[in-house]
Amino acid sequence: MDLKAQVQGFMAKKEVQLSDELAEKYGVPPEEVAGVVNSFLKDTYGPAIRLAQDIDGKVGVVLLFIGRKDCNICRRSEPILESFLSCHKDLELVKLDYSQSSGLLYHMIHGRENGMLPLIAFIFQGAIRMIFTGECLHAAIYEKYYNECSQNIYVH
């Protein structure tokens, strides 16, 4: 799954959805509200888009962790994640708080309006190799996904 394509697809879908909703609400053609919608989307999702572009340009494997400070599941997952990362210095951690504007990357990657936190993704050269959401209480789970991700990386 290509990160850049996911972001572009999400933004295109949002643009159509919001344009249609506003057009229906105000009884105007969608083209008439396109400028307002584009401005809103740029302001709202801009930080997440820029972050996705940064991640896309990275050479090594990125482990993306999107959680929330007040999420107990996220907090329980963090020490396990840190332990896993201490054994895998080749990974670059990108840790986001879902409540921040860059945390909207969650929806761009996950593709749904709602879901479970945290979201954990292994991304290599702009390709999302593995993604999972929810509680992760064992380093073996990270290890499993890391190994699958590594196999996929070296095959391509």
Model-predicted regions and their roles:
Residues 1-59, 150-156:
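N-terminal leader/targeting and pre-domain segments
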Residues 3, 113-156:
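Non-catalytic, surface beta->alpha helical segment in thiol-disulfide oxidoreductase systems
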Residues 31, 79, 139-143:
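Generic alpha-helical secondary structure signal
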Residues 62-64, 120:
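Hydrophobic beta-strand anchors of alpha/beta hydrolase catalytic cores
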Residues 64-70, 75, 81-106:
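Thiol-based oxidoreductase modules, predominantly thioredoxin-like and allied folds used
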Residues 107-112:
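Charged, often glycine-rich, active-site loop that binds/positions anionic groups
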